[in-house]
Amino acid sequence: MKRLLCFLLSFSCFFFGACTEGEKNEFQTVLDSTNALHKAQISMVSESSIRDFIPSLPRTEVGFTEAELASLTKSLNRLADESKSVTIAQAKQDVNLLFRALRYCYGPYGYFGGDEAFDKAQTAVLDDLSVFGASFQIDKLIESLREHLSFLQDAHFTINGKSLVDRYSYFSSEEPEFAHDEAGYYAVLDGYKQYISSINGATDVEAYMKYSISMDGRLVYYIGTLSTQTEKQLSITVSFENGMRELTLSKVVDRQTYDTKIPYSADWNAVVPVVACRDYMQQSTFQSFVEDASWLSSEPTAILDLRGNRGGSEQAVQAWLNSYDYYGIARNLYGKGYFSISSRASNYLTAHTLSAFSSLGNSAALYDELIYLYQHGKNSCVLQRDNAKLRWNNAKKLLFVLMDSHTRSGGEWLLESLRTRGNTVFIGTNSEGMLLSGTGQYISLPNSKIHFTFGNSLLLTYDERVFEEGRGFLPDLWVSGDALERVQKLIEYYGLAP
């Protein structure tokens, strides 16, 4: 795909101010190549079977007294004060409760090694406590838990508000601008083509060359990379045929041009309709988003803005997909395999954290149902997708999907399904990378007040070539916070509006 644009595509529109019919054909060639890439990625899925990770729980055993479960839900609205102290006896009680909660309620428990891995981690934490003394600060317990649970590469899993997964951010520079021809990647510097020979000493520069959109709507290349470093800038050395240049790549700031306080909006009067959704956690937002999906699907060219979308329940995602394309991409929700644990303990915990899930509707009725299942139900596992294959959908209408590093969880459920739709182009930066599980369980350890979030589900989907926790999905065109303005310029420049 990255070798499709020639010198004329990158620069003729700049000089002459309008896109020719030939350049429209060039965009179609790029679109065809994008379709081919997405179609090939359908087979790039986890090799594991979801059934290998279904927990084996005693049918009726709760695993806790009701007093213990109640103690885990008393301080859900605040994090622990890490400067306070606990006794070793209190810490041991907390550790015991935590690992039991993981055993009975954590969806990826088997995925991350089951009893063998978690028993080893628990023993290591208890060993640490024995050398901390009779009383110690809570931050020591947190440090021990983070160290020995670091194998939980699940971005939804947090210990006192912090994930164990390193997050990747996009660093880029739009100076200089690059194009590509048969000889390689080049920039026009001082009036001459100058070809890149290496970046940071590596002659394979493909990984650094990011397909993008210029401010006036042209398809171009910029140098960029993903990094887990926390600094706002990083430096690279670009070697040209006639010398070297030091470039400073800046961390892209995503939330520049959209308001996260407006959860949903739809502009049907624009040249190309724009539907923007930042989350579907509230019932009103969720309903509007779903109701408008069928209208969006009828548009010959449309923009779906999922930047900053922090998700919601999978029921909301399923409803939107059903409304948008019931017989097509809706079939691909839940990836290759998906299950959720419905243990008696997890039902109790979920019932007491319902305020976080208002998109599910009548919380009072759901609370009563969950408490009934806790009191009278049995431990079970709901298998919603088993060793399925993703299916490609040859859609004809053009859809641009905007995404950024704040598109996560339920927002990424939509990205996952939309990747199986033809003529769909993803624009922005990498998504946050939070798909493996969810956040259905909130607990606070009774003595230390250390707060945990984790999910009772497990999703197997694309493998690390397409998606990774903490790195997310990658866009087709890498654009910073002004992605909406640039895609509108792209549509105007290449004459893509109906």
Language-model regions, residue ranges each:
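Flexible, low-complexity junctional segments that flank or bridge functional domains
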Residues: 20-319, 326, 430, 439-446, ...
